[in-house]
């Protein structure tokens, strides 16, 4: 069962919110890697989930950059 954020939910966020989520996820990944190195990690699956979430965020940002998808505030500008 996936516990990460679905891509559809990420597509509803603004770019600022995506960048904030990306920063938070990267910080969490750093902490998880530190826990793994010190032998304190209790949930190895979380490491993979966070990496996948980071990839999803990058994918949504890239889709917007290429014009394949528009953000939620793009429709209000017209």
Swiss-Prot record:
GO cellular component, one term: cytosolic large ribosomal subunit
CDD domains: Ribosomal_L29_HIP (cd00427)
Keyword Nuclease: no
Keywords: Ribonucleoprotein, Ribosomal protein
Single GO biological process annotation from the record: translation
Entry GO MF terms: structural constituent of ribosome
Similarity-based family: Belongs to the universal ribosomal protein uL29 family.
Name of the protein this chain belongs to: Large ribosomal subunit protein uL29
Source organism (scientific name): Rhodococcus opacus (strain B4)
